[in-house]
């Protein structure tokens, strides 16, 4: 009895809570004071009488006797006690009505009962009797005494009477808290039993009342209830009454019988039983699922509880017993002692194939009984048990509010078997499952839209966020670099009054640096208990206008624009000043500021949008008023001009970028006033103007579409024009944003005026070209503004002529041009570095313009870009300060660059604009402008990204831009894609996803760049492509053909632009490629991406569409040489190839696909096919770039990556795998990884960003090299030759499967190098493939012969890059890439030889012929690594992985060899790699190694360029050094 009493007491422990809950605190007093039993007696009598229908008076004693006899614990309590207990507990469980009423009524009686039990059996008996009398009073619900469940508990039975009584009270409360299950049991029984609660009618009161449950609970009933429903002293009463009732009901028989059999059974629900006993064990073989939505009684069935795979069901096995037994299943509490759950019941699920079972009610708890049969090995999959949720109101009615306080939403399935021993006794085994969450999990929060995209650094503005699943406890976080936990983040203040699940209002927190000079992009995400939002929304902090003179400047600027009220006047002014750089700068600033304001106004006026150029300008001028608001203008500028990316990413990063991209592209074609001015300064126009125009265009997509349509025609013209004039236009566009940033504008104007004046005046041809371009642009822009397409056609012709002149300059001085370009590249590197320093500002505004154009353009343009980039002077000042600090040397170099650029300005500008600038620079720059904004938004998000962007953007404009964005935006498009991608990628940028996208985009970009600078070449297709065409065949002619072909290609790729421009780019791309649609992922984004030349990038991002698009782009690139002749067919082919490239996915799937790829390659038999295939692969890689995140991570584990790469890279890898060596397959897979991994590795190494940055640097360098090379090649017309030459090797490569690698590398590298490098890239890739594929050796030989100079450059830039890229994830595989260039033949000859040959390969990268000859792999490799851009990047990329890996990668393409190579790798290389790897280390170390690497790479670049003079190489090295010093930023970001 003491034990019973104790159990009752433990149930009573809740008595404390019942105390407060129950009207009678005296009950508690009564428990200890047995004397107080009489008052409870009445209560208990009432409860005994139990309305539930228990025969309180007589049945209880009988029950008591039965119970006492049946239940040892109850017997210990005393016969009466046991009966009381038993009855009460069953009552509690079985009759929740009784329980609640009885409990309430019984609160006294049960308390009495408890005390009685505590006192003695006699007292209990008396109590029972008393309770019977009290039954009449039973209606006194108030007297619910604490549930004696615990009293019933066996564990409590040993308590002393009074002490137990007290304990029981405490234990009750304890139990209730301890196990919701007891409480729930109570609640369940009360729920079922609760006749009191009218609602309960729906519950099966009779069922639950059956004594079965009561008997179970006899002793443990109270326990059961006490835990979850422990608080119901009424339980005790109700249990008592219920028992009587239940016993009287047949429950008695059941109870007795079950008590007999099941005293164990009755304790079953509340009692604690072992899992293993007497050699018998009840095991849960398969645990149930962790979350199962319970159903309400009024709902339909939600099915049975499944296992965690959702394919099966929880499975139970009984070991050590071979006779049929009954398995009982009920729902218990989620933790602690096993008790029935108060709020959840088991319910039977019937179905065609479910196990037959029966539903039994024990103590108010539903128990499912299923047979365990030896025929099934005593194993049973329980597929017939669901979970039923009881209504809280029913539970409360049953057990009282106190008992139902604890609402646990977790439950366990409890499995129990009763095994009858030979002596007739019963052995009970019980095992609970793991907890199951019975509610719907909270949804992950999402942000769908926000009202504000940018804000000053002061913050405090309100942002409305519309989204999903904003639950209580939501936090809105602003974080600078979402991927870096240590970056600045701040929690925004939420207006809780207007808090809602789907919307909330927050105040923007102030930015930590109140003195930024350039817009900074951060990410916004929401965190709730369910996790954080996956998509990170971009948000831009703009410099405080009050802090700087921006307002004054802006006002001044605005005032000047205010004077020209009409667009015509402005145009006239622009025209008059068009030739004058200074005037042009000023006018564009004035015009641009209005443009920006007009963009702001455009929101008001949709018509201006229609006539993008004219209306824009006129609205701009007309909207001098708008401009009048300096801050608005500045903000608009920062959003539009300074950060076209801002406006696109900030305002509507997804939609805006597309329109912006289109707008940007379109503005190029058609901003009459701005273009005139801008085209005078080519640089500004593509990026800035598009930004400005984008800003103005953003408001009306129709106008944008129209503009885009116009732009399609104009795009060819304007792009040609832009190619030659891009620098000036960009500068002016930059100035336009600068005007918006008045201080920056002034500085930019002065700088641009000075620089452009130096640049343009110094080269007479350039000045002539510029003047012609200005005239053409002025006329054509005016015409385009007024006449739209006809004007654009004229403009195209004019542009073509101007580009021809430029190209003539370029081609006339191939060596000089190359030198100039090398210098420009070096200068660009410096400028880029400077811009890198400025890159934050550049990122914020037309950073890419600075990066891209400045690379190609003069430092002055970089300055103007910086100014433009910085929406405010403060931004540029900061940039300048950064430049000065980080790049005083760079500044000096920039000055030198400016001088050298001025000297070589004519050549360089002509070269840069038409070829280098146009090809890599102008395309890249306009993308850069577009990108920069995004970069601004994205980079601010990731300072590392910024650093990377700076570094990368500085070396190659496109690469830099891509790098600066580092995010998909960068990759997606040098400029416009950046915008669009940034818009789409902004969020991505902001988030880890963004990083992956960035990685993938960047990879795509890198690959794009590598595959003929596909991004730039997308622009190249429009502008760079034309440039490349110019390089290959007369910039203008080829540009036209490219535009025509490229138009088609652009229709596939650049055509995207046309279509995109006519429609939103997404639309363009949708039409552009079914694949684009197939790439649903980034169709819109792709639209944006494609909208700019970056469609390819996006295509890369999305496999199907980007594959097709990329092929065309690649074709255009590849066909830049080849494609010129057959660009459309190749484009078509490349789409086919790309469709085949879907086959490439098959190729990715493996060799068959590889063969297909090869056949594709063979079918195309041109590098462009190769590139397209490779690009498609790359695209696939990029498309699978998210996979590349796989690959990236897999790249870390390349074999893993290889499967994914096989998906991604295997097209290429398959090509690689086609090679005889299986390891080469892996390596080639890695090579492909490296190629994509260049991207992939960038993204995939521990420091994927660093790798990407490194890769980007490499790519940028390569791009520069490519530009140089392309200039060289274009000057030499080697591109065409190369293309033709390359085509055969690609064919060879394709046929041998080597081409996949070669094509990939070519595509990656040649994209990087543009087409001139494409052949070398192919060859390089072929050599890399040669490792795997002996056939490559033949290709390799042609590759070296054809592209020894190109290949050298290619190799320096691209193969190493690929290897390097590979290195982060898997150096060995990446090694394959490196091997391919130089050691391909050697590798073909013997894999072991390649070790030494590899060093030659790498050294050939420095000097492909000579180094190839040299076999000391470690040293050459070290030098190669140091010297080759790829080497540097390799080191950098390897840095993520390991210097050994780097050496290994360099050392060998073959994995086995890789280990050897790794071991043999020169210490220098590892050291430098280590330094680069430790880019996290002091930037100085990374810098030094990077500097050495970059400088060495620059010389390599010159070998790569082969036309580049060593002096130029030295300049490049210096630039690289300065870049590396600036690159410290990159290094830091790495």
Swiss-Prot record:
The keyword Cytoplasm applies. Residues 293-300 bind DNA. There is a cross-link at residue 555 (Glycyl lysine isopeptide (Lys-Gly) (interchain with G-Cter in SUMO1)). The modification N6-acetyllysine is found at residue 122. Residues 264-443 form the RHD domain. Phosphorylated at Thr-135 by CDK5 in response to osmotic stress; this phosphorylation mediates its rapid nuclear localization. Poly-ADP-ribosylated by PARP1 in response to DNA damage, promoting recruitment to sites of R-loop-associated DNA damage. Induction: Up-regulated upon hypertonic conditions, this up-regulation in not observed in ES cells. Homodimer when bound to DNA, completely encircles its DNA target. Interacts with CIDEC; this interaction is direct and retains NFAT5 in the cytoplasm. Does not bind with Fos and Jun transcription factors. Interacts with DDX5 and DDX17; this interaction leads to DDX5/DDX17 recruitment to LNC2 and S100A4 promoters and NFAT5-mediated DDX5/DDX17-enhanced transactivation. Transcription factor involved, among others, in the transcriptional regulation of osmoprotective and inflammatory genes. Binds the DNA consensus sequence 5'-[ACT][AG]TGGAAA[CAT]A[TA][ATC][CA][ATG][GT][GAC][CG][CT]-3'. Mediates the transcriptional response to hypertonicity. Positively regulates the transcription of LCN2 and S100A4 genes; optimal transactivation of these genes requires the presence of DDX5/DDX17. Also involved in the DNA damage response by preventing formation of R-loops; R-loops are composed of a DNA:RNA hybrid and the associated non-template single-stranded DNA. This is Nuclear factor of activated T-cells 5. It comes from Mus musculus. The gene is Nfat5.
């Amino acid at each position: 009895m003491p034990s019973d009493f104790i159990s009752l007491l433990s149930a009573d422990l809740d008595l404390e809570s019942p105390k407060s809950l129950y009207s009678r605190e005296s009950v508690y007093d009564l428990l200890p004071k047995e004397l107080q039993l009489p008052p409870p007696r009445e209560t208990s009598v009432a409860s005994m009488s139990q309305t539930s229908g228990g025969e309180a008076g007589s049945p209880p004693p009988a029950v008591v006797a039965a119970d006492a006899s049946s239940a040892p614990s109850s017997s210990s309590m005393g016969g009466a006690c046991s009966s009381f207990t038993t009855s009460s507990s069953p009552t509690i469980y079985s009759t929740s009505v009784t329980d609640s009423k009885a409990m309430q009524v019984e609160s006294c009686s049960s308390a009495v009962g408890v005390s009685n039990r505590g006192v003695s059996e006699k007292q209990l008996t008396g109590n029972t009797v008393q309770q019977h009398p009290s039954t009449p009073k039973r209606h006194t619900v108030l007297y619910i005494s604490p549930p004696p469940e615990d009293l019933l508990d066996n564990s409590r039975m040993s308590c002393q009477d009074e002490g137990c009584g007290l304990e029981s009270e405490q234990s009750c409360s304890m139990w209730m808290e301890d196990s919701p299950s007891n409480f729930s049991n109570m609640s369940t029984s009360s729920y079922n039993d609760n006749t009191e609660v009218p609602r309960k009618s729906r519950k099966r009161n009779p069922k639950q009342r059956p004594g079965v449950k009561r008997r179970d609970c006899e002793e443990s009933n109270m326990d059961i209830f006490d835990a979850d429903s422990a608080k119901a002293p009424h339980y005790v009463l109700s249990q008592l009454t219920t028992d009587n009732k239940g016993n009287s009901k047949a429950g008695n028989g059941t109870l007795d019988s079950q008590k007999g059999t099941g005293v164990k059974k009755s304790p079953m629900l509340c009692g604690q039983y072992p899992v293993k006993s007497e050699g018998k064990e009840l095991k849960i073989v398969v645990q149930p699922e962790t979350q199962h939505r319970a159903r309400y009684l009024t709902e339909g069935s939600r099915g049975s509880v499944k296992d965690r795979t959702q394919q099966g069901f929880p499975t139970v096995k009984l070991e050590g017993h071979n006779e049929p037994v009954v398995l009982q299943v009920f729902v218990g509490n989620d933790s602690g002692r096993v008790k029935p759950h108060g709020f959840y019941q088991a319910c039977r699920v019937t179905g065609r194939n479910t196990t037959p079972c029966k539903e039994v009610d024990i103590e108010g708890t539903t128990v499912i009984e299923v047979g365990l049969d030896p025929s099934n090995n005593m194993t049973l999959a329980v597929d017939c048990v669901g979970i039923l949720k009881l209504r809280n109101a029913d539970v409360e009615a049953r057990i009282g509010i106190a008992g139902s306080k604890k609402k646990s939403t977790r439950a366990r399935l409890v499995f129990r078997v009763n095994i009858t021993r030979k002596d007739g006794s019963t052995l009970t085994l019980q095992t609970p499952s793991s907890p199951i969450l019975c509610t719907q999990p909270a949804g992950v929060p999402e942000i769908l839209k926000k009202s504000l995209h940018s804000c000053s650094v002061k913050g405090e503005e309100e942002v409305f966020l519309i989204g999903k699943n904003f639950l209580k406890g939501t936090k809105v976080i602003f974080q600078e670099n979402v991927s870096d936990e240590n970056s600045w983040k701040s929690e925004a203040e939420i207006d809780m009054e207007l808090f809602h699940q789907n919307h909330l209002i927050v105040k923007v927190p102030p930015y930590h640096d109140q003195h930024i000079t350039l817009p900074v992009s951060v990410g916004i995400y929401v965190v709730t208990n369910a996790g954080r939002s996956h998509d990170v929304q971009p948000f831009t902090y703009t410099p405080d206008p009050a802090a700087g003179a921006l307002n004054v400047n802006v006002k001044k600027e605005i005032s000047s624009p205010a004077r020209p009220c009409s667009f015509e006047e402005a145009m006239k002014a622009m025209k008059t000043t068009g030739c004058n750089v200074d005037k042009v700068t000023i006018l564009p600033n004035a015009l641009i500021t209005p443009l920006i304001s007009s963009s702001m106004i455009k929101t008001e006026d949709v018509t201006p949008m229609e006539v993008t150029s004219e209306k824009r300008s006129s609205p701009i001028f007309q909207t001098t008023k708008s401009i009048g608001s300096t801050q608005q203008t500045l903000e608009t500028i920062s959003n539009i001009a300074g950060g076209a990316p801002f406006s696109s990413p900030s305002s509507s990063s997804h939609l805006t970028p597309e329109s912006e991209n289109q707008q940007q592209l379109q503005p190029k074609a058609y901003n009459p006033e701005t273009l005139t001015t801008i085209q005078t300064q080519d640089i500004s126009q593509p990026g800035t103007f598009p930004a400005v125009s984008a800003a103005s265009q953003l408001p009306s997509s129709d106008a944008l579409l129209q503009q885009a349509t116009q732009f399609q025609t104009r795009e060819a013209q304007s792009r040609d024009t832009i190619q030659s004039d891009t620098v000036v236009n960009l500068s002016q566009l930059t100035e336009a944003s600068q005007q918006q940033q008045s201080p920056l504008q002034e500085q930019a104007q002065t700088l641009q005026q000075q620089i452009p004046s130096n640049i343009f005046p110094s080269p007479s041809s350039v000045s002539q070209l510029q003047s012609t371009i200005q005239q053409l642009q002025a006329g054509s822009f005016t015409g385009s503004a007024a006449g739209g397409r006809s004007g654009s056609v004229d403009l195209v012709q004019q542009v073509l002529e101007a580009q021809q002149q430029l190209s003539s300059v370029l081609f006339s001085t191939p060596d000089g041009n190359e030198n100039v370009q090398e210098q420009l590249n070096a200068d660009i590197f410096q400028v880029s570095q400077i811009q890198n320093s400025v890159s934050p500002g550049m990122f914020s505004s037309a950073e890419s313009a600075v990066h891209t154009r400045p690379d190609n353009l003069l430092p002055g343009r970089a300055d103007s870009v910086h100014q433009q980039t910085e929406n405010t002077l403060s931004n540029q000042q900061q940039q300048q300060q950064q430049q000065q600090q980080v790049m005083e040397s760079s500044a000096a170099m920039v000055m030198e660059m400016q001088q050298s650029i001025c000297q070589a300005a004519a050549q360089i500008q002509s070269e840069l604009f038409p070829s280098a600038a146009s090809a890599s620079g102008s395309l890249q720059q306009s993308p850069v402008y577009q990108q920069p904004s995004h970069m601004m938004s994205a980079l601010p998000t990731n300072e590392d990204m910024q650093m990377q962007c700076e570094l990368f953007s500085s070396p190659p404009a496109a690469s830099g831009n891509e790098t600066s964005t580092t995010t998909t935006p960068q990759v997606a498009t040098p400029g416009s894609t950046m915008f669009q991608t940034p818009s789409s990628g902004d969020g991505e940028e902001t988030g880890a996803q963004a990083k992956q996208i960035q990685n993938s985009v960047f990879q795509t970009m890198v690959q794009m760049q590598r595959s003929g600078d596909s991004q730039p070449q997308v622009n190249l297709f429009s502008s760079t492509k034309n440039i490349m065409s110019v390089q290959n065949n007369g910039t203008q002619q080829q540009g036209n053909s490219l535009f025509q072909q490229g138009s088609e290609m652009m229709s596939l790729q650049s055509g995207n632009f046309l279509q995109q421009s006519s429609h939103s780019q997404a639309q363009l791309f949708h039409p552009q490629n079914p694949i684009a649609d197939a790439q649903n992922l980034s169709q819109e984004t792709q639209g944006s991406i494609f909208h700019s030349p970056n469609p390819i990038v996006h295509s890369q991002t999305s496999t199907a569409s980007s594959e097709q698009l990329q092929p065309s782009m690649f074709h255009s690139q590849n066909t830049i040489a080849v494609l010129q002749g057959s660009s459309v067919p190749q484009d078509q082919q490349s789409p086919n190839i790309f469709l085949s490239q879907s086959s490439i996915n098959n190729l990715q799937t493996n060799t068959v696909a590889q063969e297909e790829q090869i056949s594709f390659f063979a079918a195309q038999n041109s590098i462009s096919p190769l590139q397209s295939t490779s690009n498609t692969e790359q695209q696939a890689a990029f498309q699978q770039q998210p996979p590349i995140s796989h690959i990236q991570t897999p790249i870390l584990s390349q074999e893993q990556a290889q499967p994914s790469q096989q998906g991604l890279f295997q097209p290429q890898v398959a090509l690689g795998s086609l090679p005889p060596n299986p390891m080469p397959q892996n390596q080639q897979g890695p090579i492909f990884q490296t190629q994509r991994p260049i991207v992939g590795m960038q993204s995939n190494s521990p420091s994927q960003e660093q790798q990407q940055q490194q890769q980007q640097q490499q790519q940028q360098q390569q791009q520069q090299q490519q530009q140089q090379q392309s200039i060289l090649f274009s000057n030499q017309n080697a591109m065409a030759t190369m293309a033709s030459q390359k085509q055969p090797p690609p064919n060879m490569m394709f046929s041998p499967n080597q081409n996949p690698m070669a094509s990939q590398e070519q595509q990656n590298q040649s994209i990087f190098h543009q087409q001139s490098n494409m052949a070398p890239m192919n060859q390089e890739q072929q050599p890399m493939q040669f490792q795997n594929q002996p056939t490559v050796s033949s290709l390799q030989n042609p590759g070296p012969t054809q592209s020894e100079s190109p290949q050298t450059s290619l190799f320096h830039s691209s193969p190493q890059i690929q290897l390097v890229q590979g290195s982060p994830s898997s150096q060995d595989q990446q090694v394959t890439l490196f091997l391919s260039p130089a050691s391909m033949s050697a590798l073909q000859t013997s894999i072991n030889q390649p070790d030494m040959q590899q060093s030659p390969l790498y050294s050939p990268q420095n000097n492909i012929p000579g180094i190839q000859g040299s076999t000391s792999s470690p040293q050459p490799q070290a030098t190669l690594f140091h010297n080759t851009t790829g080497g540097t990047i390799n080191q950098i990329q390897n840095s993520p992985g390991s210097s050994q890996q780097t050496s290994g990668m360099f050392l060998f393409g073959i994995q086995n060899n890789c280990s050897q190579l790794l071991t043999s790798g020169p210490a220098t290389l590892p050291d430098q790699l280590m330094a680069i790897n430790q880019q996290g280390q002091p930037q100085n170390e990374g810098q030094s190694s990077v500097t050495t690497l970059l400088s060495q790479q620059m010389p390599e670049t010159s070998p790569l360029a082969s036309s580049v003079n060593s002096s130029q190489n030295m300049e490049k090295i210096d630039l690289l050094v300065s870049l590396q010093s600036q690159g410290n930023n990159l290094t830091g970001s790495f």
